[in-house]
Curated annotation (Swiss-Prot):
Pfam families: HTH_WhiA, LAGLIDADG_WhiA, WhiA_N. One of its GO terms (molecular function) is DNA binding. Residues 280-313 bind DNA. HAMAP family: HTH_type_WhiA. Keywords: Cell cycle, Cell division, DNA-binding. One of its GO terms (biological process) is regulation of sporulation. This is Probable cell division protein WhiA. Belongs to the WhiA family. Involved in cell division and chromosome segregation.
Length: 325
């Protein structure tokens, strides 16, 4: 089972069940996974799901919320041979009008009630209803990419109006939801791992939340280790390059004027550098007659580098200066 399917299975068992929350959830299910029909003034509707737990959750909402017993059909998905489509049908009935009234999906004209299949603010006035709406919306048209690969939560909307309504609900929880047009649909999405964790918390997918947090921790540790290794590698390369440069300069000095012509303090460190090519600056410093720290050793080696540079310019005969520290 994918991460997204697992999260949906969990949320399906935790739908908020107060009267107002049921209406918000049913409205989302019908809007994003359903169709409403009208024939001879009588309404009927159905909703289809690929997830059995989601279909069962919607079935129970209709039963508990409106005392309606729905018909259920199960068919093999023609697009995905291994999957089934679960369709929950509420047959034509005069009672269905009352349901649509409570969901704010109809409006009255002088002659009759006509379908107004758009989401209304009245459905999500309370914070609990907003949560129920997000639960049902996620179950109907949401998906989460495998967090091992990337952090991405999205909702596939048919209209810009629906996308903006969902975006507004998400922003009421301080989510930075964005909208992008994809072919003929509108996608509302979150890309930050922390925001997806917060969203899972709001809709009650706590097991999925913990799994995602564990993945985030492992990925962060892995990234930290990689950064540390890269940093250590860069420092090691820098140290090796500096050591090779020092050795090359000392050998050049030996061939030109001879190491013996260097001041005693530079002569001592030069010989140690040649003899212990793999030693660190700290180790070289500890081998001196009068031990020095890394900065002191580095200072003397820089002086040697400068002498070699002057000699390479040519025409300048190096004169042995007086000993200095």
């Amino acid at each position: 089972m994918s991460f997204s399917s697992s999260a949906k299975a969990e949320v399906s068992k935790k739908l908020l069940q107060t009267s107002c929350c049921r209406k918000a959830a049913i409205a989302a299910f019908l809007k994003f996974a359903g169709v409403i029909y009208k024939s001879e003034g009588i309404f009927s509707f159905k909703a289809s799901f690929e997830n059995a737990q989601t279909a069962r959750a919607y079935f129970l909402l209709m039963k508990n919320g409106f005392s309606k017993h729905c018909e259920v059909t199960i068919k093999k998905n023609s697009k995905l041979n291994k999957n089934y489509v679960y369709t929950i049908i509420l047959p034509p009935s005069t009672d269905n009008l009352q349901i649509l009234k409570e969901l704010h999906f109809v409006k009255k004209t002088s002659k009759e009630y006509i379908l107004s299949f758009s989401l209304k603010e009245e459905l999500v006035k309370k914070k609990c209803c907003k949560k129920a709406f997000l639960q049902a919306t996620f179950l109907s048209c949401g998906s989460i990419t495998n967090p091992e690969k990337m952090y991405h939560l999205e909702f596939d909307m048919k209209t810009k109006e629906d996308a903006e309504f969902l975006q507004k609900v998400l922003r009421s929880f301080e989510f930075e939801a964005k909208i992008v047009e994809r072919k003929s649909h509108y996608v509302v999405y979150l890309k930050e791992g922390e925001q997806i964790v917060d969203f899972l918390n709001i809709i009650g997918a706590h097991a999925a939340l913990l799994e995602l947090e564990n993945i985030r921790i492992v990925k962060e540790l892995r990234n930290n280790v990689n950064r540390l290794v890269n940093c250590e590698t860069a420092n090691l390369e820098k140290t090796i390059n500096a050591s090779m440069r020092h050795i090359e300069n000392i050998e050049f000095i030996e061939k030109t004027i001879g190491i013996d012509n260097l001041p005693e303090n530079l002569r001592e460190i030069a010989r140690l550098r040649i003899k212990y090519k793999d030693a660190s600056l700290k180790e070289l410093g500890s081998m001196l007659k009068n031990p020095l720290g890394k900065s002191g050793v580095n200072h003397r080696l820089r002086k040697i580098d400068k002498i070699a540079e002057e000699l390479r310019k040519g025409g300048i005969l190096y004169a042995k200066p007086s000993d200095e520290s």
